[in-house]
Amino acid sequence: MSNFEMAGTGSSRNNEEDNQQNTNWVWYKHTNNNLSTSHNNQIWQQPSLDLYPGQIDVCDMTTSSRSLTISCQECGNQAKKGCTHGRCRTCCKSNGLHCPTHVRSTWIPIAKRRERQQQLQTPTSNPTGGSGRVGKYRDINQHATLDSSGLEMGETRFPDEVSSDALFRCVRMSGTDDGEGQYAYQTTVGIAGHLFKGILYNQGPENKSMRSTQFYENPPRS
């Protein structure tokens, strides 16, 4: 019995060694596959580059759609997008580099920016105060002087007051806010050799203190 047990014990040890060898063979085979796979990955994988300030990784631009911030190679500020030298406008100009992206500057001084913001924030009021329309007026760049005889601008002198016959045509103005329209009168007059056109809007009932104006439906034409 003891010999039989010893033989069985020896056979079991041999089986364990065979299993261990088989296990080791399978484990080494799996390791070789990993090595071959990693070797293939190393062949196809592109090496990473050390980027200096102002350089762009071309691989990131083709594979990523996020916006990149480019720094100037000299001062470290934000460089102009599309600059081939990788510098800002000031550094390109100081070094004498001809860059097409730095030809025109989009920088606006802070004084002009504040003035523009104040103009946008200031509402334009209607001088007549009638139907709440916002009038748009063009600034006159030429210097004008006003005296007792009228307004003089350049070589043209405009009278202070004009009394002339004009034809007023009744037109219907459509409203954009409420959809309801109103009636107005359109006229064209010539003063001092210049043509003036305008529209008279309805300002409500006539005030008795105002000087009445006599209108003709069909005024005589010269």
Curated annotation (Swiss-Prot):
Expressed in cotyledon tips, leaf primordia, hydathodes, stipules, and lateral root primordia and weakly at the edges of petals and sepals. Zn(2+) 1 binds at residues 72, 75, 83, 88. Residues 72-99 bind DNA. A motif (Required for homo- and heterodimerization) lies at residues 191-194. The keyword Transmembrane does not apply. Disruption phenotype: No visible phenotype. GO terms for cellular component: nucleus. Residues 118-128 have a biased composition (Polar residues). Residues 114-137 are annotated as: Disordered. GO terms for biological process: auxin biosynthetic process; auxin-activated signaling pathway. It is found in: Nucleus. GO terms for molecular function: DNA binding; DNA-binding transcription factor activity; metal ion binding. Zn(2+) 2 binds at residues 72, 88, 92, 99. Keywords: Activator, Auxin biosynthesis, Auxin signaling pathway, Developmental protein, DNA-binding, Metal-binding, Nucleus, Zinc. The keyword Nucleus applies. Coiled coil: none annotated. Belongs to the SHI protein family. Transcription activator that binds DNA on 5'-ACTCTAC-3' and promotes auxin homeostasis-regulating gene expression (e.g. YUC genes), as well as genes affecting stamen development, cell expansion and timing of flowering. Synergistically with other SHI-related proteins, regulates gynoecium, stamen and leaf development in a dose-dependent manner, controlling apical-basal patterning. Promotes style and stigma formation, and influences vascular development during gynoecium development. May also have a role in the formation and/or maintenance of the shoot apical meristem (SAM). This is Protein SHI RELATED SEQUENCE 4. It comes from Arabidopsis thaliana (Mouse-ear cress).
